[in-house]
Amino acid sequence: MLSALVNRVSDKVQVTVGVAQNVAAGENSGGAVDVTQTAGDATQTATDVTQTATEVVAEYVKMTGAGRARLVPVSYVDELLATLVAGGATVVEPLAGVPVEVCDIKGRAAAGELLVADVRTIGAEFSPACRLGAELAVAEDARVPGYVVVCMRKCCIPWVAEAVEAKACPAEDVTISATGAEEQASARVSRHAASDAAQVVAAYLACHPRVEAVRYPGLKTDPSFACATSQLVGGFGPYVDYMWKESPGEWHRFTATDEDARTQIINFERLG
C-alpha cells in the first residue's frame, strides 16, 4: 500500500515543483525573480566571512523588495510592534492558520490595510513582502544575532519609518557573528528542503485512502493555490494540514523537515 501510494504522487509532485520553479523564475504577479536564492547561493554565502552588517541589510532589502532596512535589537521588537499596532497596523505572517492559508498581502495592502509582515518563521527568501505591499517586513538572520532586520517599503509612511528609526542601531556598529554565515546558509537550505519535502507529503496525503481533505498551498486544488503562486517565491513552506475520514472537522498538522521525503512518509505511516 505504501509503495503504491508513494508512486502515485509523482504526477502531483511534478505539477507542484513546476509551479515553484515558475515562481522562482519570476512568472508571477509579484515579479520576484531577483529575490530567489538557491542552495548553491546560500552555500556561497557561508564562505563569505568578510560580509558586513551593512551588506546583510542590503541583502534583505533586495529579498523583500523594500526601499531600505534597519537593524533593531531583539529587546525592542515587541515594543516596536506594539507601537505599530496601536497606530492601526496589523501583524501578519505569509503562512498562518490551521488549516494553513497564504496571507493575501498584495490584496489586503491594496485594500488599504497597513500590514507588518513577520517573515521570521517562513524565511524572508520565500516572501517579497514589501514588494507585495506590506509597510514593513520583520526578518532575522544568524549573521546578526541579537537583532532583527526591519525592512521598510519604498515610500514608507513617515510615522512608521520614524518608529523604526527610533529603535534602530546603525549597521556600521553591528559586528557580524563569526559562525553566523554558515548557520544562516544552513537554515535557508534546510527551509527549502523542508518545503520540497512538504510538496511530496501533501501529494501523498491527497492520494491516501483514509484522508478526507488536505490543505497545502502548493496543491492545485488548495484554496490558497492562486495566492501562493503569485506571492510566494521558491516554495510553499513546510506545513501540510490534513483531516482523517474518521475524524471529520478535526485538522492535523504535518510539519515537514529537511529529511528525505520518503523517509518522512514512512515514519508518518508508522506513527499513524
Where are these regions (language model features)?
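Residue-level detector of solvent-exposed, low-hydrophobicity positions
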Residues: 28, 44, 51, 232-234
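Conserved PLP-enzyme active-site core in the AAT-like
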Residues: 2-21, 32, 52-209, 215, ...
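Residue-identity detector for glycine
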Residues: 26, 30-31, 40
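Conserved C-terminal alpha-helix-loop-beta "cap" of PLP-dependent enzymes
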Residues: 199, 203-272
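Long, intrinsically disordered low-complexity tandem-repeat segments
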Residues: 35-53
